[in-house]
Amino acid sequence: MTLPTLTSPPPQTLRRRGRVVLSAVLAATLGITVVSVATDASAADALLSQGKPATASSVENATFPASAAVDGNTGTRWSSTFADPQWLQVDLGSTQSISQVVLNWEAAYASAFTIQTSANGSTWTNISPVTAGQNGLQTLNVTGSGRYVRMNGTTRATPYGYSLWEFQVFGGSGTDPSLPTSDTPDLGPNVRIFEPSTPASTIQSAVDQAFNAQLRSPTAQFGAQRHVFLFKPGTYGRVWANVGFYTTLAGLGLNPDDVTINGAVNVDSGWNYGDESNATQNFWRSMENLSIVPEGGTNRWAVSQAAPMRRVHIKGNLTLAPSNQDNGQGYSSGGYLADSVVDGVVSSGSQQQWYTRDSRIGRWDGGVWNMVYSGVQGAPANAFPNPPHTTLATTPVTREKPFLYVDSAGLYRVFVPALRRNSAGANWPNTAGTSIPMREFYVAKPGDSAARINSALAQGLNLFFTPGTYTLNDTIRVTRANTVVTGIGFPTLIPTGGVEALNVADVDGIKVSGLTFDAGTTNSPTLMSVGRAGVHTDHAVNPISLQDVFFRIGSSVQGKATTTLAVHSDDTIIDHIWAWRADHGGAPTGWAVNTGDTGLLVNGDDVLATGLFVEHYQKYEVIWNGNRGRTIFFQNEKPYDVPNQAAWIGPRGNGYAAYKVADNVTDHELWGGGSYAYFNVNPSVRVDRAFEVPNRSGVRLRSVLTVSLGDVGTIANVVNDVGGAVPNPAGNTTPRNVVAYP
């Protein structure tokens, strides 16, 4: 093959399989608290190059212009002709001090290059030594100044040209004054902050007002209301907080025991319009980072999807079922508990399925179909299906969710817990991690545009979303390693015009948490993506993580999206998501109305999902193409609204499996997975299998089941052609269980 016949290579697929670095986990192992302020140079300096004029010595063709390397889009790139030397330069518009250059190389990179600056674009000064490039992200700390900055490549590493996804220059005077930051930020009108000196009657009145406005309301489930109640460190007198839709209660201490509430943080049935008799629609609420001394000894948290309890200390008992659970209709259906301590007994009662991770409990009583535990001290023994407990001694990889707290000086900070491996028990007190001052966050508020949010990211800030709805006419692009993107009070991102709402680059350590996505009325190919298709970079030491991220196709909006979440980056941690194509909403729903093929697409290798809820999509609901994937707890309901069998024929027969592992995957594990059918539009509809996986010894499923809810609709087998059908001859929503496959 001669050079003139070459075209740019496909994205690189090689991996560096480094594993655990001792220093990265030593502090956590020894139980030492590590608190440090983030010092990434780009967190203090501005991104100067994005969107500025760029030129190059050559381009391979018009598809790969110089401007593509400074457009903030990691899916476009500059590529040169196949010769040495070549350069790419950006005009910053005025002379700036330069502190850092970040190069995101495609597979065709430089084996020797320098970074140069110039005041006039003709006389150049080296501000870096001759440097070898690398496939993927490369960060150079430099010192210099100039209006023009260029990468001057002298030797290619491949027969191809030089190719950069992004060329980022940082420096200047720092933050944009139009994007103010503060260590005592305004969190907006939907956030109430209490102190121990606040009268209990004031707190009670505030939480009652929020809840009573939702009491048997026909609109609250998909309403615009958002309520966050934050408690500064201290002890609070009797507060009985009923928790409704889009409501969060959280402590502002560094540890849960820094905030003590006497009374209850209560979720029950009997109040939701049209569904008063059960708790199966108790969605979108949360409790975090506080302790409760429950009145009467037991706190009630009868929730279903998208209702996490994290970093909580229950100084008594905890029940997860509604108070009418013994009256024939009292069900709750699927919750999540992590990084918590329950001194007494956890009673699950009529809770149909539940996942508990890295916690300590006194004892667990009960279980209906699918109760899963990983890293839980005091968990029941593994006994699936009778009783239906699936228990793992540890969780393979964890990084707990970032949380807001107030330091001793009254300043606000975000604590980012460190990565743990083979973890068990709560990660507090003495949590290892990093404390970031709020001045390094842009505090987003409803009404902020995508351009304003991207400008904050471009100047090196993290993002903190306050409660409310954000309409986005462009994609929010997170490109800097270790960026924290978090929210409180279920901030909801709605794309318009079919754009993707959030794009996370294939770089180390980005953390996304506490966000809700609503599909817009114009179909989006994806609502959120992580990494770039076809690229496999080893992030094992510092993975990207997603926590409490929820997706809806259909809500108050008749949304459409082909795939809600696509994960391309290797080693990504998916810790508690709910991807939901709505079976009901504030706006009408239906088979041809709120359309969506797939909830989760995983192309990355070594991806771990802990607490995976995906429901009602129209084709394969989870597609797992990456190798060495692991899921601990999976909950699914098939689409209710299939009109007839002819409308729902998949590649291998009737319908689509809920959980599809690609035929070429050689290594995959799932512990504790349930898929349920309720084909109420046409009960004659059937799906041939709930789980579809290749028949290989390395692909292993443990504790999986199917249920026909109310015996409405048929799932013919659990896994491939194994397990038998539901409805069972026994009827009465009796599950089919497969303990191990193969």
Name what the model sees in each region:
Residues 113-115:
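Short beta-strand elements bearing conserved aromatic residues within extracellular beta-rich modules
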Residues 1-43:
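Secretory targeting and sorting signals
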Residues 175-742:
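Extracellular/periplasmic carbohydrate-active domains that bind, remodel
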Residues 152-159:
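Short beta-strand-plus-loop segments that form exposed binding edges in beta-rich domains
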Residues 30, 44-93, 104-109, 129-132, ...:
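Disordered, acidic Ser/Thr/Pro-rich linker "stalks" and the adjacent N-terminal cap
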Residues 125-142:
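Extracellular carbohydrate recognition and processing domains
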Residues 96-107, 151:
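A short beta-strand element within beta-rich, extracytoplasmic domains
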